[in-house]
Amino acid sequence: MALYEHMFLARQDIAPQQVDELLNIYKGVIETYGGKVGRVENWGLRPLAYRIRKNRKAYYVLVNIDAPATAIAEVERQMRINEDILRYMTIRVEKHEKEKSAMFSRLDRNGHIGHDEKHPRSPSRQREDVIEGVE
C-alpha cells in the first residue's frame, strides 16, 4: 500500500460536527478498501485566498492515509459528488511526517500558535505596544 496526504476544504456554512461526519464517512471508505487512516489535523475555519463557489472561508482538514490506489480513487469520486466539499487534493508521499504540519504549527496573524483538540487556543490577550520615550 502507498502513503498519501489528503486535504479537503469543506463549505463554511456547515457545522463543525458535519465536518467530522464527512471525515468519518471517508475514513469508512478507506477502511472498507483495506487502508488505514493515520494522523488527522482539523485546521478549523480559515479564510480562502479567493472565493470558491461564493465561499470566502472553508474548513481545512489534512489526513495521512496508508491505502491502495483504489481506496483513494473511491474517496476522490465521492468528494467530487459531495456538494459540501469545495476542493480536495491527494499527494503520494514517501513517508508521513511525525510532527504537525508546518501550516498547523505556525503562528497565525494574531500571534496564536495553531491548535488541536488536546491543546486549544488560549484566549486572546490585549496587546500593549510600548514606544520608548513616549508616555
Swiss-Prot record:
Pfam families: Ribosomal_S6
GO cellular component: cytosolic small ribosomal subunit
Example GO biological process: translation
Gene3D superfamilies linked to this entry: 3.30.70.60
Annotated segments matching region Disordered: 104-135
Entry keyword annotation includes NAD: no
Protein's UniProt keywords contain Ribonucleoprotein: yes
Superkingdom assignment: Bacteria
Any one GO molecular-function label of the UniProt entry: structural constituent of ribosome
InterPro entries: Ribosomal_bS6 (IPR000529), Ribosomal_bS6_sf (IPR035980), Ribosomal_S6_plastid/chlpt (IPR020814), Transl_elong_EF1B/ribsomal_bS6 (IPR014717)
Keywords: Ribonucleoprotein, Ribosomal protein, RNA-binding, rRNA-binding
Task performed by this protein: Binds together with bS18 to 16S ribosomal RNA.
HAMAP family associated with the record: Ribosomal_bS6 (MF_00360)
Family that this chain belongs to: Belongs to the bacterial ribosomal protein bS6 family.
Name assigned to this protein: Small ribosomal subunit protein bS6
Lineage: Bacteria, Pseudomonadati, Pseudomonadota, Alphaproteobacteria, Hyphomicrobiales
